Amino acid sequence: MGEADVVPTPWIYPADEPDPEEALAAPEREEAIEAALDAALELDPAAIRDLYEVLLPPPSVGEGDPTGCPLLLTYDYGTAKAFYWQGECTDSLGTTFSGMGYASWFEKAQFDDGVLADGFDYSLSGRIEAADGTWLEGAGVISSYYAEGPDTHGFGRAIDGVYQAGGPRAPDNVWLTSARRPSLRVDGWTYRPTQGTNLTLTGGLSGLDGFPGGVTAVSFEAFTMRSATAASPCPSEPGGLASIRGPSGAWVDVSFHGLTDEAPKPDPEACDGCGDSFYRGAAAGPTCVDPSSFLDWEGDEPW
């Protein structure tokens, strides 16, 4: 058999894979992280809670009805109150319930060191629709709190899940009308004597549209920004991890050098405002984010 002869084979070999797409450029990574931070500071669980309460006003303790529409149970925990509902029914007002939910709220709950806190947690797995066509549906949990201490004001907001709403009484709110899919928590505090500020983000946002570079998702892990007036040794750079998913579905991870609660003493020589980026396991250059504009708020909270 000559060298030019070809021996048939029963195997089918896949075509060579194309070269992987290049990582997003640094400006696109930076703009996407900053856009996600802007969105995080617009996180609005209260808009969802308010519509929830329009459709299902919170009952007083003792007003529950385990045989009604919907099944409704109430709880009294002192400074906290709660209720649970479940049903597939239409009540006497024409409101239709399908699914289940839980809500709790607390006022002046006392914690260590004289801290007093107010807040709420609401969950929904299903749909509620009023007779006038106003509706809310979703699957997830929302929460919000603020806490008062002798010198510090703390706060936090979270949306974990997707909510949609419509009808004449539904608000025009991005967290109820867009394709965004949040699983994001934002916590922070203000130290009043020096107006020192701190923000920490955990979780992410997907289903993004119109973000720089076609980015479709951004996630954060212990992503912390703290001002110089809050005694940060590295106020010019965040700490923690940010990850950006490009239009191809591949992620770029950015590890920043600032402080986090787990690592409060960052290397001062690495504190240059830029994190180290990695794409498909290889270094992809620096990504720089200036936290100052996100920490410069008046009063106790950035919202």
Which ranges hold each PLM region?
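Low-complexity, intrinsically disordered segments exposed to solvent
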Residues: 1-303
